[in-house]
Amino acid sequence: MLFRSQDLGFVGTQDGATTVEQLAADLQSHLDRTPTVLPGDGRPLRRLAWCSGGAQGFFEAAIAAGADVFLTGEISEPQAHLSRETGVAFLACGHHATERYGAPAFAAHVCDAMGVTHRFIDIDNPA
């Protein structure tokens, strides 16, 4: 998915639909963080867009891509209004919680390519 001329976000489509409540519960279970949920218009969620960390500014790109829901780490005031106006759900799952898997994966990739080692130190952060 293209966010401001950079291929940073992702869009996925699932066969069956889920509800925003079900998705929020699944994310809370996997990320160990209670998401902030803007439920949109309650439509079944089939097309999901996501970008980890502080990607709330990409919500409009997710809407333009036809997403039923956008998942990211943070939320700002404009996203609340956009969710109400468009009916697209928005879940802010925590900046740290949504990025704690990417950093070790990237480090492992670099280590494999360069023959070095790394140690990831996961310091919990409520943000």
Predicted regions mapped to residue ranges:
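Hydrophobic structural segments
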Residues: 1-127
